[in-house]
A protein has these predicted regions:
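Conserved short histidine dyad/triad with adjacent acidic residue
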Residues: 148-161
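Conserved cytochrome P450 K-helix E-x-x-R motif and the immediately C-terminal K′/meander segment
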Residues: 151, 164-175
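A generic secondary-structure signal for well-formed alpha-helical elements
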Residues: 52-60, 111-118, 122-126, 201-208, ...
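Active-site cores enriched in adjacent His and Asp/Glu residues with nearby glycine-rich loops
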Residues: 123-149
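Active-site environment of non-heme Fe oxygenases that use a 2-His-1-carboxylate facial triad
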Residues: 4-11, 112, 116, 146-150, ...
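Signature of the catalytic double-stranded beta-helix
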Residues: 88-133
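N-terminal auxiliary "cap/dimerization" subdomain that precedes the catalytic jelly-roll/cupin core
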Residues: 1-93, 100, 111-112
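Catalytic core of Fe(II)/2-oxoglutarate
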Residues: 2-7, 173-275
Length: 275
């Protein structure tokens, strides 16, 4: 499959604004719900990648991080090849090395900048951004920092086709395998050195649904990884609303247009991912 040659590329300005080469690139990114982002110069990717690579070793002490419910800890997904160390922001300082916790908070800043840019174009009044995002745009909400690798002993999908649950996903992947669905066809997303892949999720699509600029939630998958493939490991950051909160929809006049519990939306998406 050929790569999406027109996948937009953005960068963050000194003012933490998301900058695209043209309005057409911006609009395509918002429509598709996916784009490349130049990694900020101060983002310590090398250290984070090394940490993720070390998790592949069976004797890594971080494999002993306990499970917290179904979403956190050192866990494996059903019907997928993913094995991962997944932790919410509130547990980063407890379980991650200090430099990795700092790295996670750097991704917090990237996620907030992206969310604020989407809100700028949505027309939703700025005074409602915090409520619409469940507090995420002011440093609250929920966030996961996950280190993922793929168990080639199983013949399943690397990751089955799905959309993400939350607002924004930030991905750093070491090898090919990611594909996105455009016009009913899956296309490769090549690894672009020095860049992260950003995609939008269902919660962001939901809260912008009645605004001046609804954004897409991209369907994507990871191809089944084979034992002779380059070892694929990745860093994945999820910007989410509070998992026990409510999603609110506003229009450009600041009027409430609808709501849904986060729990209900995420439960539906979880069934789609694992069934």
């Amino acid at each position: 499959m050929s790569p999406p040659s027109d996948l937009p590329i953005a960068a963050l300005s000194r003012e933490q604004r998301l900058v695209f080469p043209s309005a057409a690139d911006l609009n395509r990114a918002l429509d598709l719900g996916v784009f490349y982002l130049k990694a900020p110069d101060d983002l310590n990717l090398a250290s984070a990648r090394q940490f993720g690579l070390e998790l592949i070793s069976q004797d890594s002490p971080f494999r002993d991080v306990p499970a917290y419910g179904e979403l956190e800890g050192f866990i494996a997904l059903e019907n997928n090849q993913q094995t991962k160390l997944a932790l919410r922001r509130e547990r980063w300082d407890q379980h991650y090395p200090r430099d990795i916790a700092v790295f996670g908070r750097q991704l917090d800043a990237v996620g907030v900048a992206i969310m604020r840019e989407v809100f700028h174009h949505s027309g939703i009044p700025e005074g409602l951004w915090d409520r619409a995002s469940g507090g995420y745009t002011s440093g609250g909400g929920d966030a996961f920092l996950n280190f993922v690798h793929y168990d080639t002993r199983t013949p399943d999908w690397g990751l089955r086709p799905h959309t993400d649950y939350g607002f924004v996903t930030i991905l750093d992947a070491s090898a090919p395998g990611l594909q996105i669905e455009i016009d009913g066809q899956f296309e490769d997303v090549p690894v672009l050195p020095g860049h992260l892949v950003i995609n939008f999720g269902e919660a962001l699509n939901f809260i912008t649904a009645h605004s001046e600029r609804t954004v897409g939630a991209i369907v994507h998958r990871v191809l089944s990884q084979r034992s002779n493939d380059t070892v694929r490991h990745s860093i994945v950051y999820f910007a989410n609303p509070n998992l026990d909160g409510t999603l609110w929809q506003f229009d450009a006049n600041g009027e409430e247009r609808g709501s849904s519990s986060v729990e209900d939306l995420f439960a539906l998406l979880e069934r789609n991912l694992t069934e």
